[in-house]
């Protein structure tokens, strides 16, 4: 009888431990990445407003040359300044979580799926399922009410797949720390890239290229050279 009691006790204890891990996964994950990738922050002076549209402005600026994790050099050509305030739907870190199969594997810090406007409200966000594979983002939803509020076109034009290149190690670490649900502000440049293998890749410069009637999210992605990150009330440069 006593052996049976202890067996049940340890089973229940194990189930409880698993539940606690699941419930606190974000907290545990956040501490893990903060420990593995320490970053220095200052206090932000402005609150983030994820209801706003991203801002960009065409720019004429010299090329930026960056060295990847294998010490190979790529050229970034800024085409616009960029400022986006949004909620993180997915953070896929390079190269641990993403394998593209070209020079980008060692150049990019991470891929962020970001939502803003109405989609930053959990009422809508919880009804949309996002996935990410091989640097491509897809999403779907089953609630037909979303077709009218906020509307299919609104959804497709208020989510973006962003490929990020950190301007320095501190920003690289801060970007890797980001978790699903974080409210962030990212500033930098939209850039066209010439890779170490001379492959050329252009950034998207409009949010509407995610929208094609009847075909789903088949549009382009933003390539962002990140010079500043705000995560909540913490500012990283």
Can you annotate each of these PLM segments?
Residues 4-237:
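OB-fold and OB-like single-stranded nucleic-acid-recognition modules
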């Amino acid at each position: 009888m006593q052996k049976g009691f202890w067996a049940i006790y340890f089973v229940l204890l194990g189930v409880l431990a698993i539940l606690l891990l699941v419930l606190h996964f974000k907290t545990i994950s956040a501490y893990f990445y903060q420990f593995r990738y320490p970053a220095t922050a200052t206090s932000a002076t402005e609150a983030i407003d994820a209801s706003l549209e991203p801002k960009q402005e065409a720019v004429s600026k010299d090329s930026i040359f960056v060295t990847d994790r294998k010490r190979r050099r790529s050229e970034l050509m800024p085409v616009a300044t960029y400022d986006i305030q949004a909620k993180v739907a997915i953070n896929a870190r390079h190269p641990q979580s993403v394998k593209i199969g070209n020079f980008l594997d060692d150049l990019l810090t991470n891929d962020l799926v970001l939502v803003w406007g109405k989609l930053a409200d959990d009422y809508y966000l919880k009804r949309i399922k996002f996935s990410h594979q091989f640097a491509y983002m897809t999403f779907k939803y089953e609630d037909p009410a979303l077709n009218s509020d906020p509307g299919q076109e609104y959804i497709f034009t208020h989510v973006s797949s962003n490929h990020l290149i950190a301007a320095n190690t501190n920003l690289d670490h801060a970007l890797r720390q980001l978790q699903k649900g974080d409210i962030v502000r990212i500033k930098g440049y939209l850039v066209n890239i010439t890779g170490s293998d001379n492959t050329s890749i252009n950034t998207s410069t409009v949010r509407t290229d995610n929208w094609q009637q009847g075909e789903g999210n088949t549009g382009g992605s933003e390539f962002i050279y990140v010079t500043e990150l705000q995560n909540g009330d913490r500012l990283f440069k």
